[in-house]
Amino acid sequence: IPAAGSEGSSSCVISNDSIDAKFGVNSDLIRPKVSFLDPELTFTLPAYQTAAGVTDMIAHICERFFSGAGSSEVTDNIATGLIRALINQAPVAIAEPENYEARANIMWSGTLAHNDLAGCGLNAVPTSRAGGWESHALEHQLSAFDTSITHGAGLAVMMPAWMRFVWREDPSRFLAFADLVFGIEPVDETEEAVADAVTAAIDELQAFFAELGMPTKLGEFGLKLENVDAFLATLKANKGEAFGGFKLSLIHI
């Protein structure tokens, strides 16, 4: 499935079902020396998995875009161009599973989304990859707790929710996302106009996920409020009290 980006990334995830945990591992020792991509191998991929894969790709890009380390005009346009391409191509691939151009564009986007190209120049720490990876850390608690939850589907819920929670920490960055991806600009520079523009962009992203058949609420997984304490305990064990580029604190969740 094109999504994880394993054909070009330095990342992998290790799951331990006995303790309901998923851990991310990153090392250039994991990155393949060479890979060959054949879009025709994805023709039989079900619509749901195609949608979940596209959601994961967009999350890989957004994690880097919202790195908290400023901006780069070239990288920003690469990143948001990939998102726009995925928004355009995903519905085509779902409607026409054997559409070679759509499948090829999605597969190539998945590689570029996670081979670090979309984060060049956005590293807060030069020796680490760009981004705080907050949405991924949050989603890992869901799919570790319930292995029937597809990673991309979990991200469709967690990423927009995370964006709504933190955007005020860096409004200019979220305005850039709104403009470059959806062409949304605030009508003026007032706080209300900025909030409206950012919220509209997040709404558009969430609506796109829903259009693909992805969930938008935790309740769609059958999860309940009492499950949150277990998620937070695992998250604290893995990440500490605060983590990510926006320093998301567990006391605020």
Language model features with spans:
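A glycine/threonine-rich phosphate-anchoring loop and its flanking beta-alpha core
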Residues: I1-N77, G81-L82, A176-L180
